[in-house]
Amino acid sequence: MARYLGPKCKLSRREGTDLFLKSGVKANDEKCKMNTAPGQHGARRARLSDYGLQLREKQKVRRMYGILEGQFKKYYVEASRRKGNTGATLLELLESRLDNVVYRMGFAATRAEARQLVVHKGIMVNGHTCNVPSAQVKAGDVVTVREKAKKQLRIQNAVELAKHRKELSWIDVNTDSLEGTMKSSPDRSELSADINEQLIIELYSK
């Protein structure tokens, strides 16, 4: 399946919630009719079956993190192999992706922008350039914006935008040096309450 390159608003409208796919300069509801699905009959949202609810939740989270179906399934398989709550572990794996950590640290305004920054070799992990967006960041790892990228206006804008987001206890960021440390594993209590990971587990468990 190819990566979606169309209007970001359409994805958020499809899921009926803000997927944080845009920079946040303007509230999504200023342009996007969040309560209306895209399409000619979008005003009438069909009542979903249990399977439909599970599928929509999976699609919502997959689109939120910008991950293709096959890769998302692999994260579920890995989470199910580990001890503990499978749903919480799944979100921990997604949050620990390098592109997401770069976004959470405020070095990019969106996850898509963070992915591009990583792919274009603008990010170092523990002093070494890493251009793999899916690379797993571990507790104690130091993520730094490379010198050649620090002057990019989009990064400076992202840092300013990040000041208005809630600080997370599991990362520590120095906005002057554009360097951050992942202090611990992502904390589920600090992640979106709008995600019902149990529905995803039920979908894949069938």
Swiss-Prot record:
S4 RNA-binding domain spans which residues? 96-158
**Keyword set, alphabetical order:** Ribonucleoprotein, Ribosomal protein, RNA-binding, rRNA-binding
Q: Which InterPro entries match?
A: Ribosomal_uS4 (IPR022801), Ribosomal_uS4_bac-type (IPR005709), Ribosomal_uS4_CS (IPR018079), Ribosomal_uS4_N (IPR001912), S4_RNA-bd (IPR002942), S4_RNA-bd_sf (IPR036986)
Return the PROSITE patterns for the record.
RIBOSOMAL_S4 (PS00632), S4 (PS50889)
Single GO term (MF): rRNA binding
GO biological process per UniProt? ribosomal small subunit biogenesis; translation
Q: Fetch the Gene3D superfamilies from UniProt.
A: Ribosomal Protein S4 Delta 41, Chain A, domain 1, RNA-binding S4 domain
Identify the GO cellular component terms for this protein: small ribosomal subunit
Q: What does this protein do?
A: One of the primary rRNA binding proteins, it binds directly to 16S rRNA where it nucleates assembly of the body of the 30S subunit. With S5 and S12 plays an important role in translational accuracy.
What the record says about family reads: Belongs to the universal ribosomal protein uS4 family.
Assembly description: Part of the 30S ribosomal subunit. Contacts protein S5. The interaction surface between S4 and S5 is involved in control of translational fidelity.
Which protein, by its recorded name, is this?
Small ribosomal subunit protein uS4
Question: Which organism was this protein described from?
Answer: Francisella tularensis subsp. tularensis (strain WY96-3418)
